[in-house]
């Protein structure tokens, strides 16, 4: 018998072949089972975690197949409906963190537990300026003299010092430069300087954190001396790191969301009062209520790290207010600025002003004046409205992504309106579709 034939039929060779066949069979079976699972598993139409609609199976046509859009749609569908998608994405994020990455999906892993979105210079700055100016030009009532613009910097500017040292945005305030350019191009509008107010509040916050660390160090040293360690070794003290605990309600921005906190909105409210000649109500005078400690916002959805602790949402309320809040699109009338049903959902920030509506009409019988305000805004304003209602008998809140009739026409039809405020945050103003319809 040929020697090669003997080797090919040896027990070891047969075992190897069986192992190879078994391995291939198992892999094939896994792929088949996984494919069947992908096809028959229940499909969601909306991702609460990402707060967006999931892709549906694309409609086939020869044209779509030819131009590649059909296969692209299939890939998007499979990606959106991949089984155990969220756990796998968390695993991916954790791996990237372990490899030392400090930026994931345009999110900086910043100090004190903050996740901060990178800033992209707006591509439609001229359009923003033009639309703002068109609004004022179209107003024919006395409110024309009281049009104010409030551009709100996000955490990448206010908390710039918290960014990783390797971040290109560290020490570079491009967002503030853009704000100043927009303000300079609108000389006839009154500027609300939210940046200076937030910058001062951030400096105070950092100072308070430093004092807390100093006090903690002093206490630790005192405890060490009193413990009588003969070898002089210093015990490891618990770190006091203001802001690292996401339950801290005194930060200016949420750790896992792009919005400012209620405290941050209060700082913005102070800046508005300064520009509008109003006397702000002291922060201590509001009744504060913590409504959740488990808020995971828009940045959390981009990062996909299910191990991140939730943020705290705190409401500031004035019990003396007598409010009537009307939603013309639904016909709903209520006496509160909040829809607490959203606290049972992931998108908890939507509790402010009941999420998205083209127009909200707010009347306060106990306001300290008979002035009326038209507020044209993005979602940042939703958490500042509870402060503004104290000073205006009536506030008309417009979200021009959905309101299609032009706020300038509304203002001209309501000569009792005394003030107009345009409030937008700098992170989303460039992509906010509502900017195109503000006049």
Report the location of each language-model feature.
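Extracellular glycan-modifying ectodomains
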Residues: 1-439
